[in-house]
């Protein structure tokens, strides 16, 4: 493939920056992160002004309200981004971590963590990802090429300019943080094939974006999957807990990947549980799309279509199904789940352990909301995404997931015989 000359320049600059950044000390990186945090606050009005342009354009295009809400920034949102950078400062630096051992022949081997190199982030219209990704990549010693959704281009331009300038002012390599300002899709297609310049691509967004990157990229991809997350309310559940957990997992922030999309209810408790949950959902404006049994119990529920079971609603919509027991629930999750986050509400230890061990997902819960699948809530600090694949990284990806292993071997005239 022929690459745009400008894209090659960006790739080469990132490669050169990654080489230098790999050896940057923790103190120097932390100093840069603090400068980035301060710069966001100092440029708040410019950032809000740019974001306003993006929001107005999105509204004029008829963009869904939930997506506009993701796009919009506020003064509080900028302060939160600044605080997130300071939190990354307080996280341990994974670069250089490792272990050391000596073989019987005297050969000394050190396994140590090193940066991946150049990370390309392809993501949708969420300006906070621009800052989070840049911070995590810098702390872990990686250069980053950012390609956000075109709807957030003005926001991303000012954010990347502000934080990159602050990092460089503290001695970080020039071009360690770069934004693809050209929103032409051909550039994205080329970026995904820039082996030799880019070491890994991390897509973050909806199913369409992730599927496109996984299908078309020749550069290695860490797949941050979509979240068709389920809650199974067991026949031995505490129903009050069930209502609380399911309601929180659906409504606390419905437009994110760890929000609940379907509830499966054991038939033994469906007649009692569904009206309790249904009334709370109805009062909050949540649309319920149910199976025949659900609709018989809740006359105001809409009849679910086949496509409702395997979709990320990302809105105040939930699918509901009555099941015979944990086996049918796990079969349903196996068929429609995306291996992201699944939860069971039960007081039965044996059933809980079966669910934990047999459900294949990055995070599996007992009596807790799926909304906890998050780097910060897991104690990793900020996250660059939630991986649903099994190779290299799985679940919330913090700093350590942006490193790999290197072996340093010390000998004294050791030869193989």
From Swiss-Prot:
It is found in: Cytoplasm. CDD domains: ALDH_F18-19_ProA-GPR. Pathway: Amino-acid biosynthesis; L-proline biosynthesis; L-glutamate 5-semialdehyde from L-glutamate: step 2/2. It catalyses: L-glutamate 5-semialdehyde + phosphate + NADP(+) = L-glutamyl 5-phosphate + NADPH + H(+). It comes from the Bacteria. Keywords: Amino-acid biosynthesis, Cytoplasm, NADP, Oxidoreductase, Proline biosynthesis. SUPFAM superfamilies: ALDH-like. It is an enzyme of class 1 (oxidoreductase). Its EC number is 1.2.1.41. One of its GO terms (cellular component) is cytoplasm. One of its GO terms (biological process) is L-proline biosynthetic process. GO terms for molecular function: glutamate-5-semialdehyde dehydrogenase activity; NADP binding. Belongs to the gamma-glutamyl phosphate reductase family. NCBIfam families: PRK00197.1, proA. Catalyzes the NADPH-dependent reduction of L-glutamate 5-phosphate into L-glutamate 5-semialdehyde and phosphate. The product spontaneously undergoes cyclization to form 1-pyrroline-5-carboxylate. This is Gamma-glutamyl phosphate reductase. It comes from Desulfitobacterium hafniense (strain DSM 10664 / DCB-2). The gene is proA.
